[in-house]
A protein has these predicted regions:
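Active-site glycine-rich loop that binds ribose-phosphate moieties when present
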Residues: 30, 69-75
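Well-ordered alpha-helical segments embedded in enzymatic catalytic cores
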Residues: 76-77, 180
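Long, well-ordered, tryptophan-enriched scaffold segments
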Residues: 83-100, 108-180
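Mature extracellular/periplasmic domains of secretome proteins
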Residues: 11, 36-42, 78-87, 104-114
Length: 181
């Protein structure tokens, strides 16, 4: 599993356990009449969230066209998951990020946040292939199909993954290294 998951340093350290729920891009944007958490009870559950936002390559996207809106940021998604009561957050790369980098890669620990915040929830990163297996083993569509549907409809396609439970623990230790100038 070490090759499939990595902790993200913007979340807090700690153990988590709960049912798994896919919540699309993990966005709550009342100003756009869009909410991936609408009608979803994620309290005490582990949420899977796509990076970025719907139609990120479309200049006419309601989410600030091709520029990332406030809803695209790691910290916004993590805070939103915590505000909805999630036990943990699992990020997964969106298709555009994979296409631009040429591969689905886990970020280096410092690449997706740098401050441990004990007020938040444990946050991890997972490979698309692993998330895809989870979604399909729960009888759902592929991650690609879900992402395409959300982008097409500009509407959530969130659902609980029946019979799927996740547990784990994140423990990140920050250290400072003195530098001589």
């Amino acid at each position: 599993m070490e090759d499939e998951f990595t902790p993200v340093s913007l979340g807090r350290n700690g153990a988590f356990s709960g049912e798994v729920v896919f919540v699309g891009y993990g966005i709550t944007a009342p100003e756009l009449n869009y909410d991936d958490y609408a009608n979803m009870d994620v309290r005490g559950k582990v949420v899977i969230v796509l990076r970025k936002e719907p139609r990120q390559n479309d200049p006419s996207s309601p989410f600030d066209g091709t520029q990332p809106s406030q809803h695209a940021f790691f910290s916004s998604k993590e805070l939103n998951a915590a505000m909805h009561g999630a036990a943990a957050l699992i990020f997964v790369n969106d298709q555009t990020t994979v296409a631009r980098s040429g591969a689905d890669q886990l970020p280096k620990l410092t690449a997706a946040g740098s401050a441990i915040n004990d007020q938040q929830i444990p946050t991890l990163y997972c490979l698309r292939s692993t998330v895809d297996k989870l979604l399909q083993s729960a009888g759902g569509e592929s991650l690609h199909a879900l992402e395409m549907a959300i982008d097409r409809d500009i509407a959530p396609h969130s659902y609980a993954l029946a019979g799927i439970h996740a547990s784990g623990e994140t423990h990140i230790v920050q250290s400072q290294t003195p530098v001589r100038m």
